From Swiss-Prot:
This is Adenylosuccinate synthetase. GO terms for cellular component: cytoplasm. GO terms for biological process: 'de novo' AMP biosynthetic process; IMP metabolic process. CDD domains: AdSS. It catalyses: IMP + L-aspartate + GTP = N(6)-(1,2-dicarboxyethyl)-AMP + GDP + phosphate + 2 H(+). It comes from Brachyspira hyodysenteriae (strain ATCC 49526 / WA1). GTP binds at residues 12-18, 40-42, 304, 330-332, 412-414. The keyword Metal-binding applies.
Length: 427
């Protein structure tokens, strides 16, 4: 029996969905514990590409119980659309559970998100405008509507009326917006309620019973450590807690029940939206990586900023999450490069920094200290054993492991489920 957390170590888009999909084969439960429809992940199974935003990647395994935990904010329209899409592809959804404690994302959250981002002007955060921040704001302000509230017509109507009146004051007086219609929202969301009802459950009890029964559980992170509300490059972060601790608070499973934490590391670095990115590339190499890796957002379609692998970021993520090992993804994207670099330290005012700076002014001015490596100039796509990787690829991976002081357990050399090298057994 093992409970394993999969967490992103960079700014998201590391390939967590691929790793979760691969490891889910050995699990009975797969859990999503935070974030919302702002977190896209792509999984390829039998050459069929699945793009998911709310549903755990484990849903692609017909015999797994997939749980959306209390820490997730759920937009019913997106959730039901994903369900319909999977049903069309003959994916079994009968084992899907939604926490009755999860919060409901409403249309006024999306409107506020967009208006607030526009209002920030040059200080914009680069939000996906999916309403995630305003929804978590309502949750923290104790104004939110939970799934359990949506299941009770009278409770939902009362809470919705209060929220609509409050939000319309804000929308009309501050943003000169027409506001939202209570009756229309009530009718729309009560319709969603009946479609959601079969999936709603006390997932905290379900998961803790599964642990007592010695089931294997995989906690699937969304976004990543550097987007964590506390530990990321604040304020250019998300509104939830993608670090390993968030898997516990977002699912109702205590930290002492976790056996293993695996950090997913893309073999290069990418970032979407605003914020410091010390190892960012602005040359032809950066464009090559973007094009070869298809580095465009699953949710927004925005081009991702690309750069060299930043070991300072990953080492910091190892500290924050207490990583037991790392899973390297997208190594194959680097197959054609003549030279590669890893940022192993930051220099500021001619001094090497210890730790990862919280001050974004400093972070935006640091000079990356690089170590250069020879490329391997051959395809890694068909390799399934670590020892059979090109020598230069192994040197690159070994040095990363040394700098971040964390072992490698998995290497992914393609998007397919089978394009995976297991270095250290997880389950």
């Amino acid at each position: 029996m093992a409970s394993v957390i999969i967490v992103g170590t960079q700014w998201g888009d590391e390939g967590k969905g691929k790793i979760v999909d691969y490891l889910a084969e050995n699990c009975e439960y797969v859990v999503r514990s935070q974030g919302g429809s702002n977190a896209g992940h792509t999984v390829v199974v039998d050459n069929i590409k699945y793009k998911l935003r709310l549903l755990p990647s484990g849903i692609l395994h017909k015999d797994k119980v997939c749980v959306i935990g209390n820490g997730v904010v759920i937009e019913p329209k997106v959730f039901l659309s994903e369900i319909d899409s999977l049903i069309e592809k003959k994916v079994n959804i009968s084992n899907l559970k939604i926490s009755d404690r999860a919060h409901v994302l409403m249309p006024y959250h999306k409107i506020l998100d967009e208006l607030q981002e526009e209002d920030l002007g040059e200080n914009k955060l680069g939000t996906t405008k999916n309403g995630i921040g305003p929804c978590y704001m309502d949750k923290s302000s104790r104004l939110g509507i939970r799934i359990v509230d949506l299941m009770n017509k009278e409770t939902f109507a009362k809470k919705l009326k209060f929220n609509v009146e409050l939000k319309n004051k804000l929308l009309k007086k501050l943003y000169n917006h027409d506001g939202v219609n209570y009756d229309e929202l009530l009718k729309e969301y009560l319709g969603y309620a009946e479609k959601l009802r079969p999936f709603v459950a006390d997932t905290t009890t379900i998961l803790n019973k599964a642990i007592k029964e010695k089931k294997n559980i995989l906690f699937e992170g969304a976004q990543a450590t550097m987007l964590d509300l506390d530990h990321g490059t604040y304020p250019f972060v998300t509104s939830s807690y993608p670090a390993a601790g968030g898997a516990c608070t977002g699912s109702g499973v205590g930290p002492r029940k976790i056996d293993n934490v695996i950090g997913v590391v893309k073999a290069y670095a990418t970032r979407v939206g605003e914020g410091p990115f010390p190892s960012e590339l602005f040359d032809d190499v950066g464009q090559f990586i973007r094009d070869k890796g298809g580095e465009y957002g699953t949710v927004t379609g925005r081009a991702r900023r690309c750069g060299w692998l930043d070991a300072c970021v990953v080492k910091y993520a190892s500290y924050v999450n207490g990583l037991d090992s790392i899973a390297i993804t997208r190594l194959d994207i680097l197959d054609e490069l003549d030279k590669l670099k890893i940022c192993v330290a930051y220099k500021y005012n001619s001094e090497i920094l210890e730790g990862y700076p919280a001050d974004l002014d400093i972070l935006s001015k640091v000079e990356p200290v690089y170590e250069e490596f020879e490329g391997w100039k051959t395809s890694t796509r068909d390799i399934r054993e670590y020892d059979k990787l090109p020598e230069n690829a192994k040197k690159y991976l070994k040095r990363l492991s040394e700098v971040i002081e964390t072992d490698i357990s998995i290497v992914s050399v393609g998007a397919g489920r089978d394009e995976t090298i297991i270095v250290k057994k997880i389950f």
